[in-house]
Each structure stands twice: as C-alpha cells, then as structure tokens.
Amino acid sequence: MTIESTNSFVVPSDTELIDVTPLGSTKLFQPIKVGNNVLPQRIAYVPTTRFRASKDHIPSDLQLNYYNARSQYPGTLIITEATFASERGGIDLHVPGIYNDAQAKSWKKINEAIHGNGSFSSVQLWYLGRVANAKDLKDSGLPLIAPSAVYWDENSEKLAKEAGNELRALTEEEIDHIVEVEYPNAAKHALEAGFDYVEIHGAHGYLLDQFLNLASNKRTDKYGCGSIENRARLLLRVVDKLIEVVGANRLALRLSPWASFQGMEIEGEEIHSYILQQLQQRADNGQQLAYISLVEPRVTGIYDVSLKDQQGRSNEFAYKIWKGNFIRAGNYTYDAPEFKTLINDLKNDRTIIGFSRFFTSNPDLVEKLKLGKPLNYYNREEFYKYYNYGYNSYDESEKQVIGKPLA
C-alpha cells in the first residue's frame, strides 16, 4: 500500500495563516520521560474525531496516510482519535473501534508507520453512554444506556423515543461487565495493535464523565447518591483494571474539569482533586500512570470559551496533587505568535502541550512551531465527513474517496 507524503497536503490558497514565533529554543523542544519512553520534545497530537474509518469501524487507508503524515517529526506523541472500546460503547458509522481482531490488525499497520517515523502512539478508549445514537444502537439490538435515565437535551429524548430505544440506567451487573470485560478487551487489542499507551476517555460528557457529574448521575447505589467517592467509583475501577492489563506506565487518563459540553455541569476542582488524590496514592505504591491529560478552561468540547467565562478557572490545582506528567490541551494558539501561555505552562518538567485542531491543517505542525513558520487555519466544516477531501487532500475528486479497511 502506498503511503502519501506529507508534502501532498496542500490547503486552499485562501486559507487564513497564523503567525508563529520560533519555539525551538523553548522547553517545548526539551525531552521528557513518559512511562518507559523518552520523548525528545513536548508536543502531542491530542484526539480529533474525524469519521474516516470504514463504516464498520475498521481503521482505513485514509487514516494510515493521515497519521503517517502527522508523525513525521520524530518523537511526536500521536493520541489517535476517540476509539470505541466496545460495540455497546458506540456504533456511529466511520468511527474506529479497538474491540476486535480486524480493528487491531488495522491499527497495527498505522502504528508501524508511526513507529517507523520515530514517533509514539496512544489510543483513546471511548464509551459514549447517553450521547450515543439511539437509532443506530436499536438497529444493532443494543440499548441506550447511562448512569441514570436523564437525557442530555430535549432533542436526544425525542430521537430516542422515536427510535423505540429509550435511555435507561445501567444495572450493577452491566457496570461490572464494562469494567471486567469490555474495557480490558479493548486494552488487550490495543497492546496487540502496538500502541505505546492506552488513554481512558473520562471527559466531555461521555459515559465515565456522566458518572462523575451530578447533572447526569442520579443513582442511589454505590455509584451515586451524590457523593464524590461513589461518582468516581466506576472511573477508578476502570483505571485499576487496566493497570492490571497494560501496566500503569502505559496507561493514561483524560479529564475535563471545566467543561459544560453535552449537558454537563462544570464540576471543577472538587471531584477532580479527589480523582487525582486517588491516582497519586496508586503512584506512591508504584503504580504511576504515564500521563494525565487535562482540557484547559479555554475550551468546552468543540467550542471555545470566552475570556470572561474563563475567569477563576485554572488547571494549576492539579499540580499540587498529582506528581506525574500532564498533557494540557485547549486553544494554545489563542495568543500566537508569542505563545506566552504555552511557555508559562511549561515552567515545570512535567508538562506536554497538546494540539488538535491545528494538526488537522498542518501535518508538519511540530516543525512549524520549532522554526516559526505560519500555521494554516483549520477547516471545521470538513472535520466530520466520510470522504478524503479536507482530510488528506483538498482535491475536489477526493470527495468521492471513502476509506477502505486496512484488514
């Protein structure tokens, strides 16, 4: 199979440019140890959902070219797009999974390209919960499940009722199955696929975050009752189980303390401090995670947050609790070309900076940041399409090209 060159990606001539001051002499380009690996610089591509897998959730040739291009700068940490941990976890078309052999074999080809470029990979395990597509689940004989039967908005309730697949609360037996079977199965396939790290998606209003959040968790059992310990129980059970499967030094977690995306209420420091305390206790006993990824208060899901609404919100509290590595991500280009916030947030030796949207339009983002070359502004209109246009190419003919399974 032919892998396209990075140089084949040419954006439209009217694309807006963002000026960049060279960052090659900053801490961004100093090494950092993450688990058992030493990354030569501190830039990560954090997950961007793009819908370019095959319709049956197998990674495609389009994704192979995409991740190969974005891992060309040696030592880049590529955290692949949110990836379904099980069929029950989500069934949206063209979203990749990591729960069967064909998916693992396809991801392995992508990882071989990433590793061949001298870079590193992490897979983000995704479980949708109440924000899943009720009709698609119904068509596959699967339920729409969540911590509690609380819809995230009126439209999602309407669609679920029309599909005849109304939202219901998970039973404790189903929760046990998620912890003991579904997540471990995905993690084992991730190891078979050659991923360096496995990241648990605990952010942005998806299932694990739904348990954390009072807006979505109305349970009256050991996973609810309003208490922090109960609401965090499922997340920490998943962490502990996957430590057994992949090892703590290959495991990671993503959190979004300040997000109000998909019907969530901002939980802020309290419950996230508890989670970090629990993870630090595990680290003190020799089970330190590879990294914790934090979403900055500048963004909530796919939306930017106004400066006014960011006031009083910061992820600095996390450094006082967790002593391991952090990835921090969320609109770090807002103060370009100087990148003063980025430089300030690198003041310690435990931080990696994540970029997402600008990686979509700049396969060579790492080199551009190092040398101070202008960045192409991203085109969100093409983020969630199935074809190759706006993904690996801007040739109009690529609107007819859909990804083919790699295995």
UniProtKB/Swiss-Prot annotation:
Signal peptide as annotated in the record: none
GO MF assignments: estrogen binding; FMN binding; hormone binding; NADPH dehydrogenase activity; steroid binding
EC number of the protein: 1.6.99.1
Active site, UniProt feature: Y206 (proton donor)
Pfam families, alphabetized: Oxidored_FMN (PF00724)
Keyword NADP: yes
Keywords in alphabetical order: Flavoprotein, FMN, NADP, Oxidoreductase
Disruption-associated phenotype: Decreases phagocytosis of the fungus by host cells. Increases expression of GPD2.
Any one GO BP annotation for this protein: steroid metabolic process
Induction comment: Induced by estrogen (17beta-estradiol).
Listed InterPro entries: Aldolase_TIM, OxRdtase_FMN_N, Oye-like
A GO cellular component entry from the record: fungal-type vacuole
Entry binding sites for FMN: T49, Q124, R254, R357
Cofactor: FMN
Tree of life domain: Eukaryota
Substrates-to-products reaction catalysed: A + NADPH + H(+) = AH2 + NADP(+)
Function summary: Oxidoreductase that binds mammalian estrogens with high affinity.
Family that this chain belongs to: Belongs to the NADH:flavin oxidoreductase/NADH oxidase family.
Protein name (record): Probable NADPH dehydrogenase
UniProt organism field: Candida albicans (strain SC5314 / ATCC MYA-2876)
Lineage of the organism: Eukaryota, Fungi, Dikarya, Ascomycota, Saccharomycotina
Gene symbol of the encoding locus: EBP1
